[in-house]
Amino acid sequence: MKTSEIRKKFLDFFASKGHQVVPSSSLIPGNDPTLMFTVAGMVQFKDVFLGFEKRDYTRATTSQKCLRAGGKHNDLENVGYTARHHTFFEMLGNFSFGDYFKRDAITFAWEFLTGEQWLALPKDKLMVTVYATDDEAYDIWHQTVGLPADKIVRIGDNKGAPYASDNFWTMGDTGPCGPCTEIFFDHGPSVAGGPPGSPDEDGDRFMEIWNNVFMQFNRDEAGTLHPLPKPSVDTGMGLERLSTVLQHVKSNYETDALACLVRAAARETGVEYSQDVPSLKVIADHIRACSFMVADGILPSNEGRGYVLRRIARRAIRHGYKLGQKGLFFHKIVADLVAEMGEAYPELREKQAHIEDALRAEEIKFAETLEIGMGLVDSALEGGKTALDGDTIFKLYDTFGFPVDLTADICRERGIHADLEGFERAMEAQRERGRAGSNFKMSGKIAYDGEDTRFHGYDKSSVEAKVLALYKGTDPVDSLSAGDEGIVVLDGTAFYAEGGGQVGDVGEISAAGGIAALFDVADTQKIQGAAFGHKGKLARGALKVGDAVTATIDLHQRQASARNHSATHLLHAALRHVLGGHVVQKGSLVNPERTRFDFAHGEAVTAAQIAELERVVNHVIAANYEVKAELMSMEAAQKSGAMMLFGEKYGDEVRVLTMGDFSAELCGGTHVKRTGDIGLFKIVAEGGVAAGVRRIEAVTGEGALAYIQAQDALIKEAAAALKAQTSDEVLAKIAALQDSAKALEKELAKLKGQLASSAGDSLADAAADINGVKVLAAELPGADNTALRETLDKLKDKLGSAAIVLAAKGDGKVALVAGVTADLTGKLKAGELVNFVAQQVGGKGGGRPDMAQAGGTQPENLDAALNGVQAWVAGKL
């Protein structure tokens, strides 16, 4: 039975038992900031189990995509070396939210596993465990199901504390908990291992395939269990494990869903297909994890989920390198994955090109340093060393992009120790340098426990209000005097407090028409809950708590912010239209001058794409759609398809902003009435802000017109300088200047090469003879990297058995190349030689045993460094 058939049978079975088939949630947990990834089927239902959320069903079933590769849920180092460990896997589950309990959960499981129309597993091949005191579950298995007593094992508190058991589940030290019953498949006596609960239970003979958790109690801080009024059921069954049973194989990687990826890995790395090559299994597992992560909006980066993706991808790439594949290969396996799993998970098909592009870009990035880094490992382990030192591990991490677990993998394969404690010391030293270099101060937080501020700013620019509180800095005061800087809290306001990327409003707060008091508001922020703090300076008069005031915004500034905020929504929708559905917002800043929008995308936006974005947005502006804001329930907003930001906290009621049928987003900001009010939209900048994150800056309305006029003036000024009359003439004259510059640069490079070459010819006579080896360390003034390499090759040919270092200074930097002839690489390594010099001039480098390059930033130390080369070489011979 194919894996896809097993998945379908499971969902069909529980649908026939009244369960709602719920699609898999994202690998990014939407409701649990404590988890980096979705690690189990119950994650998307956590708030339902805790009573914080209600759904219109009480029974559910899912096939949930899961990832375990970060934090305490981390199987990464075992993947590829065991039959069952994975980073990505699918978990089948059925759930009861205060509906059925133990009897139905157990009989459902038994019927699905053994029923002739379902999986029809042999009953004598199954055995179960129950919690030691769970007599109810034991009796259901023994009396209702009819399982013999010798097939039921009671498991007690086997982890050193009350209720610390393989068969007792807890959500934490307190809260929902309960016993569980696990179902095992017996592979037979030909496989090593004993039954659960026995001393040799860790063998492979008895394999757990299904776990039924019974959320029956609430544990208080004293450790006492109290029965829950509505007990629930949470079950999980690994699809890959179940497939091994039904396909009569011993390893998950032999199942149809994974074997096809192992074959694809063999094809792309150029090796023969075999289940005995761990590297092929690593690649097969990791292509699933990486592809699903990218499909769910994660891109490789140096932090958080993006770094986990980078670690997994680079581990796979390194295993390809280990098999001899030095070219790009990993992204080519995405198509095989889509063919296998695209029907069950349509997001793979929809985002295939994006996934391939993201993984290909990561391959290219790592390829730049992989070979050099591996050479550094080889050099560090010369002389039969049994450990890789922490400083080298840190250098691999910091300079060459080797995740620490990847380096640990390499050490494990070679049977040597990885000095991870030394690595941590090097990391801490870097953190200390970072802390010493930083110079920031935390701003104080205001303590406020009064009433909230009512916001009237969607339809009013001025409101009458009462002063609820006043502050100087973070200290509460009864009054402010002329010249005082402070914060004013009102019971009502037209001022928008900074949020959702939009800056706070500015304006004034006045008493008695500004005669009694006039407070200039420079910013508005939420200081506690929904209480708004109006920050500014009292220009005249006095202001006291309890005063009646008028709060009036700067309408011109507000309208400019509104234009830019509405344009941001249009840009977001246009980005998804032009670049693809993978685009998600990563941050924004909206102020009266411009809008700045950060979004997930793996490469620079091209000039043609920017032009298309501008065309699309301005087309919607010209259409003059009405901008509608509507309050609705969160559930209704989700069903409407409105865009919402991952990680943003929303209440039960949300504000949905729509612009025709082009854009719909959850937003609490201020906006124009119609899209035509934006006037004009112009992108002024595009660039990268982090790995996989791009930023676009744009202006609107009068700001866009001013930008275009400034660009026009610049072009006219350039034309005058070039003595050109038309734009065509400007381009022609620029092209002519470029051609002339290229010709001069080419001639200059040729002359430099000739000078360096002639200098190199004369240098051969300066080589010292040390034990029959020619040793030369010299500076070539004016040489570039190409000239250094060409001269090095000539000298190696001319000198025979030789070790050579050549250097050049320029722009406050040092360029270095080192070469060792082939007959000496067993004793001398070019990488070690070049680093000996580079470290003395403030640099580092690497390369092959016969040729290496480096750079430095301390040219004043070059002469001394070169003078030490002869002694260094003599010490190695």
From Swiss-Prot:
Any notes on this protein's domains? Consists of three domains; the N-terminal catalytic domain, the editing domain and the C-terminal C-Ala domain. The editing domain removes incorrectly charged amino acids, while the C-Ala domain, along with tRNA(Ala), serves as a bridge to cooperatively bring together the editing and aminoacylation centers thus stimulating deacylation of misacylated tRNAs.
Give the note describing cofactor binding and stoichiometry: Binds 1 zinc ion per subunit.
By its UniProt entry, which HAMAP family does this protein fall under? Ala_tRNA_synth_B
Q: What is its EC number?
A: 6.1.1.7
Q: Which UniProt keywords apply?
A: Aminoacyl-tRNA synthetase, ATP-binding, Cytoplasm, Ligase, Metal-binding, Nucleotide-binding, Protein biosynthesis, RNA-binding, tRNA-binding, Zinc
List locations, semicolon-separated.
Answer: Cytoplasm
NCBIfam families found in the cross-reference section: alaS
Q: What is this protein called?
A: Alanine--tRNA ligase
Which cofactor is essential here? Zn(2+)
Give the protein's function: Catalyzes the attachment of alanine to tRNA(Ala) in a two-step reaction: alanine is first activated by ATP to form Ala-AMP and then transferred to the acceptor end of tRNA(Ala). Also edits incorrectly charged Ser-tRNA(Ala) and Gly-tRNA(Ala) via its editing domain.
Main subcellular location? cytoplasm
Specify the species: Chromobacterium violaceum (strain ATCC 12472 / DSM 30191 / JCM 1249 / CCUG 213 / NBRC 12614 / NCIMB 9131 / NCTC 9757 / MK)
Q: Organism classification, top ranks?
A: Bacteria, Pseudomonadati, Pseudomonadota, Betaproteobacteria, Neisseriales
Q: Which gene encodes it?
A: alaS
